[in-house]
Amino acid sequence: MFVNFILIILLFQCSINIKENNLETNKNTMLVHFIDVGQGDSILIQVNKKNLLIDSGPNESEDKLKKYLKKLNISKFDYVIATHPHEDHIGNMSYIINNFEVINFYAPKVENSTKAFETMAESLIRKDLKIKILKANMKSIDLGNNVIIDVFSPLSNRYEDLNNYSPIIKISYKNTSFLFTGDAEELAENEVLNAGFDLKCDVLKIGHHGSSSSTSEKFLNASNPSIAVISVGEDNTYGHPTDVVLSRLKEAEIYRTDINGNIVITSDGLSLK
């Protein structure tokens, strides 16, 4: 109960490079790393000498995440986003909070928490880090040099399914754009569609690891990506990605962490080389 009370207080306060080479950034390059954390999500964006982390994957993948970040010599995250309270997305957030300098920490306001979320919150309290609320129509986050983050959801404070708290986020760099969806289900997708947001993107991170409950035909038609990335565990017990979603993606170039491992997409602001 004490942790839940503290949580409430806190909450209110481009080339495809699947071999992981050429990871150095310069002032004209944005790197988007889809880190292979098994059945979960962890995405690192590097641009303008800034590091942005979206989710941290499940705790069982901690060693993978550690090795990947160590290879990149990362010591600081300018922005960290916890999309929703499920362990496969925030299982390593305590490791991130405890071992790296974190400047800004974002998460949606949720009515219910999980053990993984409470563990994360305890680490935030120890580091005296406040959670900044992610919600639709909040002010865009400007990363400089024409890199903008727009947040399209959540559009409600109450969802029965925690997946729908996942923020649908668009990161634009000049003429290129990436759409990140966490585990947002069709309900959240429809809310964003009905709100009239510009979902068109070059790269779409497929929702909920390729579950049939996400990435609806309407959402896919609106986003119309040329590249689709699925973060998913090899031989997972959920049957992800589903054949239904894969068939919907027939017009896109598909990359999967269970097949390709770590995936890196590079943008120069004009194209994905």
Regions found by a protein language model. Name each.
Residues 2-273:
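Non-globular, low-confidence helical/coil segments that flank catalytic cores
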